[in-house]
Amino acid sequence: MIPPEQDAEFVACMEEVLETYAQAYDPKYPVLCMDEQPGQLLKETRVPIAATPKHGRRVDYEYERNGTANLFMMFAPLEGWRRVIVTDRHTAVDYAHVLKGLADIHFPDARTIALVQDNLNTHAKASLYEAFPAAEARRLVERFEWQYTPKHGSWLNLAESELGVLSSQCLDRRIPDKETLIGEIAAWEHDRNANHTKANWHFTTPNARIKLEHLYPSI
């Protein structure tokens, strides 16, 4: 959803994100988008009937709910890399440990990671202090350049788009448990990363100033 009228805060946050996406790739200063979504685990109550030359695979309409999981999507759009972490919950502590993995495992040699994310209340520096001692929390805070999409501007977060691809290519069927979910996502992730599939993003600040002119204050 885009605001219907002039909104200086929206365009300021939007341009900050767009300028980040316009940067040339630099491994010392990677751009990383993060988003998350819940997932429902569903078990079959009857064994599906395999496909035949005359019929596709047939699945009974009944299923059994088997809990939920949370998916953290991390997507580096300039290099075509993504990583999905499956957790039981989506607390501040879960979020903090995902950031620690980014900083220390996936991008240990980066000087600063430009982190683009939505304005969820857990997506904050404070979450690191809930999970780690102060010195460690501060170290991790300083590894990131914290950027937020504007309110009603989650479409600017490329991790949201990548979650959409994941949902359509991998999560479009019943997945019975967390272990199966992790395995299915890992296979999808491996294929996407092997092909270095990047974001097909062409929206720039100059584009925004023309197409979204109504959002800019009249001066």
Language-model regions, residue ranges each:
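C-terminal domain-tail junction helix/linker
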Residues: 3-6, 45, 180-219
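Extended, low-complexity cationic-aromatic segments
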Residues: 13-100, 212
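Acidic/histidine-rich, metal-coordinating catalytic segments
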Residues: 110-124
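Short, basic/hydrophobic alpha-helical segments
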Residues: 93-114
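A short acidic (Asp/Glu
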Residues: 43-44, 124-130
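Mobile genetic element proteins and their domesticated derivatives, centered on retroelements
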Residues: 33-35, 74, 80, 99, ...
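Active-site proximal helix-loop segment of RNase H-like, two-metal nucleases, encompassing DDE(D)
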Residues: 159-178, 191-195
